[in-house]
Amino acid sequence: MQALMLAAGMGKRLGRYTQNGTKCMVQVNGKALIEYAIEALVKANIKKFVLVVGYRSEILKEYISSKFNESNLNGMKIEYIENPVYDKTNNIYSLWLAKEQLLNDDTILLESDVIFDEKILFDIIKSPEKNLAMVSRFESWMDGTCTLLDEEKNIVGMLDKAHFKWSDINEYYKTVNIYKLSKEFSTQYYIPFLEAYQKAFGKNEYYETVLKVLTFLGSGNLKGFEVRGDQWYEIDDPADLAIAENRFAPTAEKLRLMENRYGGYWRFPQIVDFCYLVNPFFPPAKLEDELKSNFGVLLRAYPSGAKQQNLLAGKIFNILPEHIVVGNGAAELISSFCSMVTGKTAIPYPTFNEYPARFCNSETVEIPVNRDTFEYTVEDILKVVDAEKANNVLLINPDNPTGHFLKKEDLFKLLDELKERNVQLIFDESFIDFAEKRYTVYSY
């Protein structure tokens, strides 16, 4: 069995990462994609590796020669086929240039921008099925050609973006762009149809389109070989590269890279997020249905102005609209408000770091808390106010991140004491939903 990689493309969407090299030379965690691929092929005992090259081909050849030789290729031969018109053609023509190789042996077909767990390569090679397309059950982050499988894993349909329907995603399997093709399949079906398709539609097409035609005609007996979505990733742009580095980082590095993303974990469906303030029970099904029902209007219509939003918020919370300011999340409101605060501000620590970071015109002083329980009392607050002659007190209730909570009667006592001292209370109840409704300082 041999392997064939299509590596002639320019990889324009990767920008600076492909200015001086090819897509398969892009580094993922300090190693080029081509290195990952060759190492996996060597371990799989592949005896010949053919690359169809074009853009920056000499640079790629030199790079491979600098990394691999007889001592670490385990007898695997590397051959190159040049696509001299790589900038005017698409991968259907690159594959056509390798037709003689496809006719001579069973082939593992790879694309140069896919990083994968070597185990899935071993598994597809060991499979008794002769003709396989590696696929993953569709997930929201995926993009590109999808397949439909029957109960016996036969591919009965291939869909491009034009025919993709979000309503049918539970039936879709995304192509991984790794195939196992027998020389009989290539001889009887694939090569003849590649030739015919190019004559009819030209060379600026995709080889998967021919597989789509074969599937439509019920020819070729191509089956789906299912793998998990976290075992591979296709790298088309810098955002993809960042995700791939997360997925394939050494275990010790994964947490650091994940934390640097600060959210967006929906791109990693296998991750369960216990760090960010997300509610696994939200939204209720009824609310979600209502949002879906009105999504078209919400998407197309211009949003209400601040006056109308204040009026609606006041209705919900039973507060006069002139006492409400609506913002794009708490961080925006905190930044705007804190810039107007002057003098000294007393804060229990640890606290939500967005506040002290935004007090650009105010000096912050610490209200000490019990280091074992993180508790503090009204008396603890007043002691610091008097000692430091504080002008403001910041209180988050329940506190973030400690969860400490002052009851309503304690809050009113604190308000009376601060009023006598002419000290302003900055009061944040962002997390009041974690307490019972009767504990909030307002009624609604």
Task: Tell what function each PLM region has.
Residues 1-19:
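N-terminal nucleotide-binding beta1-loop-alpha1 segment
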Residues 123-127, 375-389, 401-444:
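Active-site pre-lysine segment of PLP-dependent enzymes
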Residues 1-5, 31-105:
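Conserved N-terminal catalytic core of the sugar/cofactor nucleotidyltransferase
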Residues 1-3, 172-260, 266-270:
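Conserved alpha/beta core of the MobA/IspD/sugar-nucleotide pyrophosphorylase nucleotidyltransferase superfamily
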Residues 339-395:
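PLP-dependent aminotransferase-like
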Residues 289-328, 332:
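Conserved N-terminal alpha-helix of the aminotransferase class I/II PLP-enzyme fold
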Residues 246-301, 388-389:
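N-terminal "arm"/small-domain region of PLP-dependent enzymes with the aminotransferase-like
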Residues 117-201:
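Conserved core of the sugar-phosphate nucleotidyltransferase
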